[in-house]
Amino acid sequence: MIIKLKKGEVVFRNPELLAVDTKMVNLDRVLTNLFMQIYSVGAPVSLAVKTEHKIESLINYVKNLEDKGLVHGAKANQDAVEDWLRSNLLELVNRGNVVKEKVSSLKPMHLMSFRVQNRKYCRDYNTADQLYMMLKANPGVLGELKEYLRKGWDLSTNSMIGSEELDVDTTGILYLTKELKDKKGLNTDTKDAKPFLEKQTELFNDDIRRLLEYKDKLPRTVFIDYLKILCGFHLALYTMKLVYLLPKMVDAGSKDVVDDWSLVVDMTDNLDSKVAPYACQDAEHIANLYRSYVRSTFVINLCQNRLKASGANASVENALAYAKNELKKDDSYYEFALQAVRNGLEDDDARKEFDEILQYFDRNDYFDKYVHLLEKSNLGTTQYKYLGQFLDAVTMKNTTSMLFADSRSKRHPRRGAMGSKLLETLVQILLLQKDENGS
């Protein structure tokens, strides 16, 4: 039985734990939204162009550039322009489907590439929020990355810098976006939150700092590809570590628990290698923790809400301590919240299911009833599916950049596995050694 809660009645996502609203994401679109946040210093951005960008409209942009004398031969070679846009500059959804194909955005090759995007096809479900939050923890790394990404564009005058050399595709992106406008809004609460797993955030920023050592040595396409791989890799590590550690933190009533998380990775291409069973067991163990992670998140959310209602400090650390030491499960606050959910159900059948789900709990144990109800609701049950989809996406499963792999056969379930491009990226950054000054 699944209790159907109304949209917005209860929220699972907690930016103080993980900013991501875990769903299937595309890492290129995540980078597009991340670049927008880096450009706007975390503020929301309103784009001036409200109409949908299409292949035809972008070809017209190029024609207008020819009218201004900025490019030559576009009108006489429209097929070549379209091929260039499709293959080199654009992210497309349903690529190749004549009916369903739509423009998502420009490829994330430059800081300003976000200006051409159709937002409904460029959703990242707050994944860029998490990455920006982590980057913001090290202003030096964030500033250096921004400086690299904005190359060829003057942020103070909002114009191109002709003296800075760029590759053809990135230059094309700048010409397509140079006349477009945007408006920065105010910062949101999400951007003010700090990463929950500080040590994992430090590792992420250290890897980005190492990658930036190659900024003048690698072609821009290769650098951006490495950046995408590292972002996906660290999103996966951060999420899996949170899934593993959060239930332990709730049990301990503190954020200070032993971080003994690990992942066995099969480095072979053999599905039946000797290490494959151990890699499968580790991946299965992570999946088996989804339920306790979802429950722990609900526990923290409810305790934070209670602390806010009483005017107390509602940080995650205080919520953990409250759940362990001060929580009263018969608190009338949870009784009223539970009753409000019941009253909001659509019909008598739903209320009957509500009562059946909670019939074996102690009568006055309103807190555990509420948590269990949320687990059994549409909000809770979808989290298990979406969390797996999110991890499959950020680990780039079954690609050359993968951290996870599986096959269609039940004999070969999901396992940790390292793709050649991920290995290449990690080797490149690990070749660098710190000097005597620690830089």
Model-derived features: where do they sit?
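Charged, amphipathic alpha-helical stretches
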Residues: 1-123
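Alpha-helix boundary/N-cap detector
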Residues: 22-29, 46-56, 72, 76-80, ...
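Charge-rich, solvent-exposed alpha-helical interaction surfaces
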Residues: 30-37, 54-65, 80-84, 88-92, ...
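Surface-exposed polar/charged interaction patches
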Residues: 37, 41-44, 61-72, 87, ...
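Long, mid-chain structured domain cores
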Residues: 87-256
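Long, internal scaffold/assembly segments composed of regular secondary structure
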Residues: 224-359
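Long, low-complexity, charged/polar intrinsically disordered regions in eukaryotic proteins
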Residues: 342-427
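C-terminal structured domain segments
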Residues: 425-439
